[in-house]
From Swiss-Prot:
GO terms for cellular component: cytosol. A motif ('HIGH' region) lies at residues 42-52. This is Leucine--tRNA ligase. ATP binds at K579. InterPro entries: aa-tRNA-synth_I_CS, aa-tRNA-synth_Ia, Leu-tRNA-ligase, Leu_tRNA-synth_edit, M/V/L/I-tRNA-synth_anticd-bd, Methionyl/Leucyl_tRNA_Synth, Rossmann-like_a/b/a_fold, tRNAsynth_Ia_anticodon-bd. The keyword Acetylation does not apply. It holds the Pfam family tRNA-synt_1g. Its main location: cytoplasm. The keyword Nucleotide-binding applies. NCBIfam families: leuS_bact. It comes from Methylobacillus flagellatus (strain ATCC 51484 / DSM 6875 / VKM B-1610 / KT). One of its GO terms (molecular function) is leucine-tRNA ligase activity. SUPFAM superfamilies: Anticodon-binding domain of a subclass of class I aminoacyl-tRNA synthetases, Nucleotidylyl transferase, ValRS/IleRS/LeuRS editing domain. It comes from the Bacteria.
Amino acid sequence: MQQQYPFRDIEQQAQQYWESNATFTATEVSDKPKYYCLSMFPYPSGKLHMGHVRNYTIGDVLSRFHRMRGYNVMQPMGWDAFGLPAENAAIKHNVAPAGWTYSNIEHMKGQLKSLGLAVDWQREIATCKPDYYRWEQWLFTELYKKGLIYKKTATVNWDPVDQTVLANEQVIDGRGWRSGALVEKRDIPQYFMKITAYAEELLADLDKLDGWPEQVKTMQRNWIGKSYGCEVEFPLAVGNGTLKVYTTRPDTLMGATYVAIAAEHALATQAAKDNPALQAFIEECKRGSVAEADLATAEKKGMNSGLFVLHPITGEKLPVWVANYVLISYGEGAVMAVPAHDERDFEFASKYKLPIKAVIKPAHGELELPLQAAYTEHGILFDSGDFNGLDFSQASDAIAAALAAKNLGKRRTQYRLRDWGISRQRYWGCPIPIVHCPSCGEVPVPAEQLPVVLPEDVVMDGVGSPIKKDPAFYETTCPSCGEKATRETDTMDTFVESSWYFARYASFDAHSSMVDERANYWLPVDQYIGGIEHAILHLLYARFFNKLMRDVGLVRHDEPFTKLLTQGMVLKDGSKMSKSKGNTVDPQELIDNYGADTARLFMMFAAPPEQSLEWSDAGVEGAHRFLKRVWTAVANHVESGIVAAFTMGDLSAELKAFRRQLHQTIEKVTDDYGRRHAFNTAIAAVMELMNAYAKIEGHDATTRAIRQEALENIILLLSPIVPHICHALWQALRPGTQLLDTRWPVANKAAMVQDEIELVLQVNGKLRGSMTVSRTLDKAAIEALAVQQECIQKYLAEGSVRKIIVVPNKLVNIVVG
């Protein structure tokens, strides 16, 4: 065995061995408990980045650890391959998006393999391939028939740079999540998935997810946004009809002084017909930001519509204002404005000199009038007629009952969650399987005619989608009547593909169904790993899709992911690595210069997985040095002759202490990998053990047996993190055996018991020394031994021993007087 650490050779050999032996091929035929470990699949951008390396190493460590613990492990990999960057790259490089994507997949697959991931590559999927998206189209048609997908003209978030519609979740602080452009509002016919039909279950089932970070569950709860309130109808002052609002504070109704409506509200459109100034204001609002966070902080603007409504209880005339702080998508697109008890209403009323009427005061004390700010706490009603003196709960009930008696309101539970608009005006996505027929209207494509294949040989000119200009794609016949018809040319939001891929891995080669019975063996995913930035978007959609698949009879479980680990970002110079900042490090260079094991070790040692990791060249050097130390330690031991069978004689105190540390390390590392996912402290414990190993002296049979035991266990403990070097070193230590067929070590409890303990010695409570004694020594023997110690003898001359106090396993206090 050579003394130098030949990382390139051993990594190539290990990877070839795993591939030729199909080591990581998963099967459902097993008597072992299953463990499905999944890291969020990558977008094939062309190159791995350090975030990928970290994400996939975490998953790989857990997969390898569980395999050695006796689990039947599946760790698959695939490609989230549709999406806008492929179109942009195609325009830039004058290639078709498909060719660019497939070329990137091949390159990145090679990079992932060079990391030594324990992946079952036979399960590889690419979401842009027809054999994948045909099932997405099939599910679309099933949901369409059930009414869970519908089409309506809606005010949508329009990204003027990417030229497409964005879901609410894809608008971050008023800007497109990918382009960063300020989002506009437009009215466009869209297909929607009825995620609101599952709002209550999506909310309630969060309580089942004990293995998820609380932060992610809180973000989803807030996004779903369940609230209890009241639907209130304000009769129009002129003509028939009412203006509906939703409020969570019915107790404040008596303080309403105007009603505010969104720019897109039907009443606003009606009022603007003869009012050019109002029409111009409405257009200005539509161009504004649509993010709730922006609405909260933006300057409040409004215009009187000239319309009036009647207060449902007092009959008082209230003006209707068009306001930029009202969302058409929440409640009814209208709010009853109570300036005295709502901050936004107060700000708006103050600006436009509208009445501010206080009707709630603190339960104890008075309200200082005139108000300098809105009083938003719950309290007691006053100046509210029959409702005076009631608290929040009593007033809410009484006012709801009064409205119901007049047929002008009722109790209502409301969700902030909106239905998911999935239509995209882009080319590189899954075609929506709908045919538009002049006679039959919208007709879903029958299952036997699926997939509707996206043509891949296209020319991107940067203006719109090529399939919208391609008669060969959109000209067709109606599946229902056979007449000439046209295909839908919008494609689906790419978040649809990633909402069910976890199930397809389990039935990767199913030809007659979306998933088959194998999915019920593997699902739910035992451990899911990905960034916290997916907390709402992807993770909510995947939970929704799992329930959709359950309800069409494809899977049995309610939730897709049992445990979730959200890994932190990789930083350099304090900020996230990015091309624009020029602070990236190419993983390929790292692997070429130091090896995949060094890259993996650094990534796992530099920080706990949930925290951000700061890149450090010195840290990489340190990781490489440590692997060299391990290699050299094994090489030296092998050179002196490996120990085939342990024959341990009586151990010296030094060897006992070392063996105790060895088995304590096994126990700690097992807990760190399995329960805590604290890979950094596991590595630190093995490093400490290596330091102790270096201090062992002697070459007798017992010492060499201890060395062999230590090195074997060190290799096993490190193998999930640095599998290549461990594969090679195990063969050197145990010729003819394979590391991956070896079970995970179990700590020897007997070896961890400390035979001897150190007791502190005190005289009259003051520290005077210490002594080492057998753990089994009784109290009388300890007392006798204590007074014989040299450090105690001189104090006994000062008087007689009056009392000896022994605190078991800690100290002996001799009272002299």
